[in-house]
């Protein structure tokens, strides 16, 4: 295990630029990243976004923070937000978000994420910035989450 990388990268989730910076002393940085991925010392969440294996993380990953990082601009909404607020009894595994971009789905080693397209004119109304120990993220208000749920269920 390359403990040095864990000590040099403070956050549990990091991007390609941070990795390149930490590994700049290696002759072939891309090959080194490939070896770290193959050995399981780092995990690719999405192209350009990485995390450490669970035993090296300082805290559990927050799916809402990841959802905002994986595809943007986006905010967590619909089923996942309703579950977060305790408005539906079901446990929701798929992190649902709204975006002004194209609809997308990502299946990653740390969870599944779905992004539904939202009209740009209505996008920013009713979004709240949530602060957690794992980072901050954008989430729909309770009312907006209900509205987005109605839109995505059409």
Predicted features along the sequence, with ranges:
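Nucleic-acid-binding surface
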Residues: 53-154
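Short beta-edge/loop segments at beta->alpha junctions of small alpha/beta modules
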Residues: 1-73, 109, 124
